[in-house]
Amino acid sequence: MSLGKFVSFEGTEGVGKTTAINGLCERLQAQGIEYVRTREPGGSPFAEQLRELLLDTRTQINDDTELLLMFAARSDHLAQVIMPALSAGKWVICDRFIDSTVAYQGYGRGFGNADMLHKIEALIAGFVPRLPDITLWLDLPVAEGMQRAGKRSVADRFEQQQLDFFDRVYQGFEAQQQAQPQRIQRIDAQGEVEQVADRIWQSVSQQL
């Protein structure tokens, strides 16, 4: 049995990942493709507990602790959900993965500091056995995304950050896309829902 495909979605706050993933899953189902839909941080029972801690506005931890908790959640998620699904020939559709860690912890928290980025690279090398086959970076102006995200009822610990934090996060996604253009594909997230869905499908269908 051939391995399934691993697709991740990335972007700053309010870019429309949930809607985009809904659309892709509908198209995969129409093609008769089995898939597992998951998310980070989270995705497995233990990782979901860590997600609650990481997103709780009452949580006060330093940047290194936050980074290590992200990878603790990811390690369990990979072992319990992602790798078994791929081995069974299923596609995995993941809302955020390693590129969010680089963008949020490496650039948002770490200001693109080489020391923090090296720590992340070492953790990826040591604990991530499989990168996504394709990563869809939903590209939307930060201010527009924040305006969308602001309509949500309750902001989590990351959503409460200031605009300059998300400007750095955006720079992190942009830098990764430029460094890995084959894996990380930029998707214009502006326009109607179906327009964005078509752009995504154009990229993903190449994996069929």
Curated annotation (Swiss-Prot):
<dbReference type="GO" id="GO:0005524">
    <property type="term" value="F:ATP binding"/>
</dbReference>
<dbReference type="GO" id="GO:0006233">
    <property type="term" value="P:dTDP biosynthetic process"/>
</dbReference>
<comment type="function">
    <text>Phosphorylation of dTMP to form dTDP in both de novo and salvage pathways of dTTP synthesis.</text>
</comment>
<dbReference type="InterPro" id="IPR039430">
    <property type="entry name" value="Thymidylate_kin-like_dom"/>
</dbReference>
<comment type="similarity">
    <text>Belongs to the thymidylate kinase family.</text>
</comment>
<dbReference type="GO" id="GO:0004798">
    <property type="term" value="F:dTMP kinase activity"/>
</dbReference>
<keyword id="KW-0418">Kinase</keyword>
<protein>
    <recommendedName>
        <fullName>Thymidylate kinase</fullName>
        <ecNumber>2.7.4.9</ecNumber>
    </recommendedName>
</protein>
<dbReference type="InterPro" id="IPR027417">
    <property type="entry name" value="P-loop_NTPase"/>
</dbReference>
<dbReference type="InterPro" id="IPR018094">
    <property type="entry name" value="Thymidylate_kinase"/>
</dbReference>
<keyword id="KW-0545">Nucleotide biosynthesis</keyword>
<dbReference type="Pfam" id="PF02223">
    <property type="entry name" value="Thymidylate_kin"/>
</dbReference>
<dbReference type="InterPro" id="IPR018095">
    <property type="entry name" value="Thymidylate_kin_CS"/>
</dbReference>
<feature type="binding site">
    <location>
        <begin position="11"/>
        <end position="18"/>
    </location>
    <ligand>
        <name>ATP</name>
    </ligand>
</feature>
<keyword id="KW-0808">Transferase</keyword>
<keyword id="KW-0067">ATP-binding</keyword>
<keyword id="KW-0547">Nucleotide-binding</keyword>
<dbReference type="GO" id="GO:0006227">
    <property type="term" value="P:dUDP biosynthetic process"/>
</dbReference>
<dbReference type="GO" id="GO:0006235">
    <property type="term" value="P:dTTP biosynthetic process"/>
</dbReference>
<dbReference type="GO" id="GO:0005829">
    <property type="term" value="C:cytosol"/>
</dbReference>
